[in-house]
Amino acid sequence: MYGIEYTTILTILISIILLNYILKTITNTMDYIIFRFLLLIALISPFVRTQNYGMYLPITGSLDAVYTNSTSGESFLTSTLCLYYPAEAKNEISDDEWENTLSQLFLTKGWPTGSVYFKDYNDITTFSMNPQLYCDYNVVLMRYDNTSELDVSELADLILNEWLCNPMDISLYYYQQNSESNKWISMGTDCTVKVCPLNTQTLGIGCKITDVDTFEIVASSEKLVITDVVNGVNHKINISISTCTIRNCNKLGPRENVAIIQVGGPNALDITADPTTVPQVQRIMRVNWKKWWQVFYTVVDYINQIIQVMSKRSRSLDTAAFYYRI
């Protein structure tokens, strides 16, 4: 009987020792495999060109001051490029083969025929409201107009950033903005926006909530208005409802696969809303030519430098200007 018990104990001890040996062997083997795998990654990583969606590299100047003309850029064999331009450019060029000519020129910069798309727009305001930016990289040509510089900067803000917007019922509710990224965006054929700030007793500050004529006018007869008021303060809002809509919007972040080339003007547009910071030009460049052929030639010359400060694709394939949430 004692012999059987000793045999059982001995068998258990041998099993434990054998199991321990097997586990150590497996551990050593896995360590060896993982070490070799990490070493392989470390060795090949300098030679791999990948897209980093988390890195944002802003442009700090204009094309005519910063970038160097180059014909030896990356070969974008699997990427698409959309070039958006005002219809006046096509009318001025007046050449049925001009797009084919540009495609051949883009080919010299590494962009295969068929990878570059040309899309015109009639009105930059309408385009900005729903840009439909479907390509991997999207470059928007925007003509500078010194009579509407502030309007154009708002349009650039819409194009270069993604927004999450909710409908506003201004007839029933007061609204307040809670951060710098929170704005009220009004669109329509004729938008006149008036606001009345309220105190903690919901009484107007410098205005009467029952008298619209005492409200402060922040925009008058415009197609697009981005309204920025004092954060943390309730406001009574009045707009021309029949010709305008208003939405409470939050800026989600930059649309990394979009850049704007400003055609003309003394300086590149500044869309920085915070007056306490140094103005920042975010993927906005400037070309200083009068004729559209010259503009397109410049774009072809610098396209690979422009692409380097962008990220391929954005958060969604359908990168319309706004996300609506009911």
UniProtKB/Swiss-Prot annotation:
GO terms for molecular function: metal ion binding. Disulfide bonds join 82-135, 165-249, 191-244, 196-207. Transmembrane segments: none annotated. Some rotavirus strains are neuraminidase-sensitive and require sialic acid to attach to the cell surface. Some rotavirus strains are integrin-dependent. Some rotavirus strains depend on ganglioside for their entry into the host cell. Hsp70 also seems to be involved in the entry of some strains. It comes from Rotavirus A (strain RVA/Human/Japan/S2/1980/G2P1B[4]) (RV-A). The keyword Ribosomal protein does not apply. GO terms for cellular component: host cell endoplasmic reticulum lumen; T=13 icosahedral viral capsid; viral outer capsid. This is Outer capsid glycoprotein VP7.
